[in-house]
From Swiss-Prot:
Family annotation (NCBIfam families): bL25_bact_ctc, PRK05618.2-2
Gene Ontology cellular component terms for the protein in this record: cytosolic large ribosomal subunit
Gene: rplY
Keyword list, A-Z: Ribonucleoprotein, Ribosomal protein, RNA-binding, rRNA-binding
Highest rank taxon of the organism: Bacteria
InterPro entries noted in UniProt: Rbsml_bL25/Gln-tRNA_synth_N, Ribosomal_bL25/Gln-tRNA_synth, Ribosomal_bL25_b-dom, Ribosomal_bL25_C, Ribosomal_bL25_long, Ribosomal_L25_dom, Ribosomal_uL5_bac-type
Provenance organism: Bacteroides fragilis (strain ATCC 25285 / DSM 2151 / CCUG 4856 / JCM 11019 / LMG 10263 / NCTC 9343 / Onslow / VPI 2553 / EN-2)
Any Pfam family the entry gives: Ribosomal_L25p
UniProt protein name: Large ribosomal subunit protein bL25
GO biological process, any: translation
UniProt GO MF annotations: 5S rRNA binding; structural constituent of ribosome
Length: 196
């Protein structure tokens, strides 16, 4: 898995919520993003610049984040992002500290491989789930989950329960459809004409 470095500055939390809201608003107005690191001995509140998060957030890849907070380095993963509902700017980011002995839960991108038999017959391949939720030790988690669809015929699907990857536990519903070859209107018309 790729890694990316993000530098932050620790911040203290105000005891009263009105002071906290004012402090967070000031951080955002100055081009910063309030962040929280969970999973360690204690919860760490820190601030990162918008530019420092750009390469981590706006990418199709998944990363192990080398967080440097006031000179102290920890490995973490991006757990959650909150965006402004109108401006689409980043409001808040949660990170989760990695423990090499404990499994983590992450969403991993899905990549389809091969030319499906159903596509050759006039169907259309549709990817229903772009990411799958997996649980494993962080050093086992791949950058992407590859699914070979060359055997997939017209009207056929690949479900989560049919997939297995060594060392990974898939957490999505077993009956959830990952990808399918759907009949196009042209293929339906040709099948109806052939049936007459």
């Amino acid at each position: 898995m790729r890694s990316i470095e993000v530098k932050g500055t620790a911040r203290t939390i105000a005891e009263r919520s009105s002071e906290q809201a004012r402090a967070l608003k000031e951080i955002r107005n100055n081009g910063g993003v309030p962040c929280v690191l969970y999973g360690g001995e204690e919860v760490v509140h820190f601030t990162v610049t918008n530019e420092g998060l750009r390469n981590l957030v706006y990418t199709p890849h998944i990363y192990v984040v080398d967080l440097v907070i006031d000179g102290k380095k920890v490995n973490a993963i991006l757990k959650d992002i909150q965006f402004h509902p109108v401006k689409d700017t980043i409001l808040h980011v949660d990170f989760y500290q990695i423990d090499e002995a404990k499994p983590i839960v992450m969403e991993v991108p899905v990549q389809l491989e091969g030319l499906a038999e159903g596509v050759k017959a006039g169907g259309k391949l549709a990817l229903q789930m772009r990411k799958l939720k997996v649980k494993a030790l962080y050093n086992i988690i791949p950058e992407k989950l590859t699914i070979n669809v060359s055997h997939l015929g017209l009207g056929k699907t690949v479900k989560v329960g049919e997939l297995s990857y060594e060392g990974l536990e898939l957490l999505n519903a077993k009956e959830a459809v990952v990808c399918a070859v759907k009949l196009t209107r042209a293929a339906r018309g040709a099948a109806a004409a052939a049936g007459k």
